[in-house]
Amino acid sequence: LNLILQTVILAILGMAVYARLKHSMVKHAALMGSGIALHTVAIGAIMVPSLLSMGALLRKLLTSFALLTIVHATLGSIVEILGVCLVATWLSNRTNVEKCFKRKNIMRVTIALWLTELILGIFVYMMLYLPA
């Protein structure tokens, strides 16, 4: 379920980038906000409970699975914080697009980290559910 949700979020982010390229800033911001909201739901409803249920798998911190999961969760937390901050900044002053332009580099870092985190999440999924 989470992998499907992450694919939907990726599609939403793709549409948001397309809206930005078409100079539709309001649509871009709304789509990004929707993506962050879905990501927040996925973290709270799926990822955190899943992580908490893996206690036995994560007890040995020096295994590749545990290290990969920790890096994935850490990057995911950073992405979530950056995304929420970016959306909150936009929501606090929707009429001033210049403030958003000033955060362009933070947006780029956020999307790069999110894509990295997504790839790591796919590896975690493969390690859990595909035969070795």
Regions found by a protein language model. Give the residues of each.
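Alpha-helical membrane insertion/targeting regions
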Residues: 1-132
